Structures are given as C-alpha cells and as structure tokens.
C-alpha cells in the first residue's frame, strides 16, 4: 500500500532507504553536516537494541562505566598504529574559553586510549583481573560521505574494554562476546543471519592483532559490518603501562580486548528486512509489536480498540492504539512504513459479528478472529513472524553467496551479492584488484564456516563483496 509513497527498491535502493528513514520518522539530518537527529520512533528501536545487548553483556560479567568525551591528543600518539588508523577521522579541539589550549584535545573516536590510562591505574595485581568494562556513549569520527545511521560524524554505540592475565583469556572473552552477545542478539532478536569470521590484516581495527566480525547481507546484496570484537594483544597495555603483579611476584603486561556495536545496526535493520512498503521490524525487537487501528472514529469502535489493546497488554505484548486523524488508508500506510509486525483493524461491520482483522506486516496475510482469541493468536503469530523473517533472510544470504574460483569471478559475482573463494587465491595483490571495483574482503572463515584463530591458518576461505 505504501508503494506510491516510497521509491521502489529496484528503482533506486539508496533513495528507498532515505525515504524509509524520513517517512518512517526514524531520523533527520542535524544542522552540522554528518550529524543526526534520532526521532522518537528511531530512538525506541535503538533503546530496544540497547536493552537486549546490555542484558547479554552483563551476563558475561562486564560492568557499565563512563569515560570522558575529551581525550588528550598525546594519548593517541602513544600507540602509533592506532593514531595512524584514526588520524583522518579525528575531530580535534584546539581552543576553549577563548584561548588556545596547551595541548589539543581529541573528541572521542573510541576509548582504548583513555580506558587504557585508567586500567593502568586500577590494575595492580593478578587479583584485579580480569577487568571487564563496557560503556554506552557517543563517538565522533569525521565522515566525508554521511548517510543517516550508516555513516555519521557522530554516532551512538557501546564499546567494551577488558584486561586479562593471558592471551588465552583475552581471546576467549572476545570470542565469548562475539558469539554469546553479538551473534545471539543478531540471530535471535534482529533475525539477522551473518557470516562470522576474522578480518584480514588490511581490514583490522587499528592497533589490533585480530578482529572478529559479523557481516550481514542487505537487500541490495551489499555487506554491512554489524559488530566487531578485537584482540589487542599487548599493544595498548605496552603503550599505557598496564601491568599486573603475577602470583609469582613478577610484573607482567596485560592482554586487552575491545568490542563494539553501534546505531548502524538500525540502518542494517532497515536494509536487511525492509521492502517496498517500508520497514519490517522483527517482533522481539519491535518497540510496538501490534497497532490497533480504528476504521472509524466511533465510540463503539474506540471502546473495542481499548478492549483489544488491554487484552494484548495482559498477554505481555507491546501495543499501541491509533484512533488517529486522517483516513484509515493513510494511517495503515504510515504504520506499514514503520514496520510494526501486526496490525489489528477494528471496524463497525466486523464488530457486529464480534470479530476483528489481524494483519501480518511481513507477508500481508490477514486473519478474521473473534475478540476473545485475538491476543493469544497474536502471541503465536509474533513468534512465527520472528522465525519466518530469520529464515527468509538466511535463504537470501545463502542464495546470493556465490562460490567462485578466482578474483576475476569474485569481481563479477560481487556486483549483486557475496562471493566466496579460497583465501590463497586472493592475497595482497588480489585485495588491491578487488578494491579497484569497490570490493573488499569482508571476513575469513574456515571451510566449515567457523572462525579461525588468525589469518595464517591453512585452507581458509574469504567472503568478498561491496559494502556500506
């Protein structure tokens, strides 16, 4: 129904995305290029993401904290690879209070440096380990080609930072975060199948010895990096003197990790599940799981809407009533664009027969149900929708991943999907050849799809594609 409102995906996918963000009341451009205003509906989706991920993070033993937005430039200069990697994106404050600062201040692009400084202060003994921290914050990375949610100069995220006594412990925890927090959230809440793997050296986080990633396929066949976990080895510990006294009384360097997911997941949600009618939100994520719409603004109809909504709330569902202004058709279109999983239509004719209509957003199917069973039916349908959305996305991922023999074939296949080939067929020369066509190696995997320990393992395959 919303096809006349939104640009069709097949006609212009970027324009379709912009239409959904604007007409779905998700976000707007801020007054400074690259900044973003997240509107209430977009914020409610991010809040749900925060809540689901935060609960999983806390289950690992990590604790939330907060560190400063302003970081001395000298902190970044201590880790050469880190500052080199972030230098083009840094926003730097040189004046404050009407005077030039003695030392420039970086507006936080990520917090490894400042958190490393305090880890060195707080960690004295092996008894202080592991130190497991997480913060929810904004970060600034100056973006030349901004796009709402996907690339903005300021965005929101969570970033976790940990310190451990051994490489084995640091690796195990970073892997735990990647599988039990990110992958679990992506599959079971966002209904997002991804390829889990590690980044090649050319794509690693600046200063990391290994970067794990979860790569999702959007409706246009491009990749979106959904979340990353980084093993930092002892690079940052060495730069910031993060030592601990071992049980034997020796001073030893810690091993650290960092990991993060951001509001670009909201963009991923739009492009992964959306259709020509707008956003489609998985029920477990949806801030509004069902909307009850009055076909006419009549007292009997409005009373019935209240009863239906009350039954949904009693069933533990998140529900909204739309008595609404404007035509019934216009209101239906607005809710379709927002992607609410279920719509209950309450009209005077149906009420005479004691029934209402229940409509699925994901496939448009409609049921006519008596008022006394609609809430329980909705509960069952919401789980079915969650299951169906994941399986549909999983099928698209499989159907549009093409096994190829060499870089030339990968270049062709990556025009509208992913290509998978032997990593030995790529190497540095192959990566350079792919980049000429705006294609990158998204991740490396073992042949069984599992994550390797590092990129030097034998017999690895790589996933390559264009990306956001």
Regions found by a protein language model. Name each.
Residues 1-468:
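NTP/phosphate- and nucleic-acid-binding module
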